[in-house]
Amino acid sequence: MTASALAYLEPDSSAELTGVYHLVLDRPEARNAISRSLLQDVLQCLQVLVCKITQPKQDEPLPRVLILRANGPCFCAGADLKERREMSEAEVIEFLQDLRHMLEQVEKLPIPTLAAIDGPALGGGLELALACDFRIAAETVSKIGFPEVKLGIIPGAGGTQRAPRIIGMQRAKELIYTGTQLNATQAKDLGLIDHVAPGSTCLKLCQELAQQMMPSAPLALRAAKMAISMGANVELARGLDLEWACYEPLLESKDRREALDAFQQKRKPIFTGK
């Protein structure tokens, strides 16, 4: 992290959550709006995280779960409209292409991802949350939605595609066509949010969910995520083939052998991600 970074990556401080990392948006004075600089900082954090996963170092914990959160009272207000007003049409197109790429990188992370929503998640901010595996919001959050149609545009970084896949086409149409802003409970009822945490912060609940995943074998978690994600929008027969393609490599893993040995020896397995 540099002094000017608008997003940073850090390990969880709890010993029980070794392997849990936080990707933090840090532009609270601008409601964590996505500027070009913030976008590039997030991309850099994602590159570092992927490197930690694919090229682990012995003196660093292997990333197991990512919590995506933000500093300040707002999760993310979407694109930086002040910056957008100064952009040419070509620059807007380039920005949207970069934003779509960034969200695809979040979605493609091989480890489970949790969006910790403690404040408004609007437009591109909600699109960012939808790219995560789970969305957890504090019960005090009162603004979750897509206001784009009221600004003369549409969600342009995956919102029109991910929202229908998560909440269904009709609900997504109503949400996007009307630009309705939901509170946390309404968003959960709609299926946009998976869990609502009491109070004004959901970080503790995110950490509890992450802790529930910690006993799982890292390679198995990655394979499960890949199988579910790749098979979600294909025919069942193709999905079953994808499931097997994700399952088969685990047969040769050291973690699978460790699990069998631990079961026989009546102890907890010690997984290494190998």
Swiss-Prot record:
Organism (species): Mycosarcoma maydis
InterPro entries attached to this UniProt entry: ClpP/crotonase-like_dom_sf, Enoyl-CoA_hyd/isom_CS, Enoyl-CoA_hydra/iso, Enoyl-CoA_hydra_C
GO terms of biological process kind: fatty acid beta-oxidation
Induction summary: Expression regulated by iron through the urbs1 transcription factor.
Binding residues annotated for substrate, in chain numbering: 77-81, 124
General function of this protein: Enoyl-CoA isomerase/hydratase; part of the gene cluster that mediates the biosynthesis of siderophore ferrichrome A which is contributing to organismal virulence. The first step of ferrichrome A biosynthesis is performed by the HMG-CoA synthase hcs1 which catalyzes the generation of HMG-CoA and CoA using acetoacetyl-CoA and acetyl-CoA as substrates. The enoyl-CoA isomerase/hydratase fer4 then catalyzes the conversion of hcs1-produced HMG-CoA to methylglutaconyl-CoA.
Pfam families: ECH_1 (PF00378)
Database matches in Gene3D superfamilies: 2-enoyl-CoA Hydratase, Chain A, domain 1 (3.90.226.10), Lyase 2-enoyl-coa Hydratase, Chain A, domain 2 (1.10.12.10)
Taxon lineage: Eukaryota, Fungi, Dikarya, Basidiomycota, Ustilaginomycotina
EC class (word): lyase
Biochemical pathway: Siderophore biosynthesis
Family: Belongs to the enoyl-CoA hydratase/isomerase family.
Reported phenotype of the disruption mutant: Impairs the production of ferrichrome A but does not affect the production of ferrichrome.
Keywords: Coiled coil, Isomerase, Lyase, Virulence
UniProt key word Iron-sulfur: no
UniProt-recorded name of the protein: Enoyl-CoA isomerase/hydratase fer4
Catalytic activity: a (3S)-3-hydroxyacyl-CoA = a (2E)-enoyl-CoA + H2O; a 4-saturated-(3S)-3-hydroxyacyl-CoA = a (3E)-enoyl-CoA + H2O
EC number: 4.2.1.17
Source taxon at top rank: Eukaryota
Annotated GO MF terms: enoyl-CoA hydratase activity; isomerase activity
Keyword Isomerase included in the entry's annotation: yes
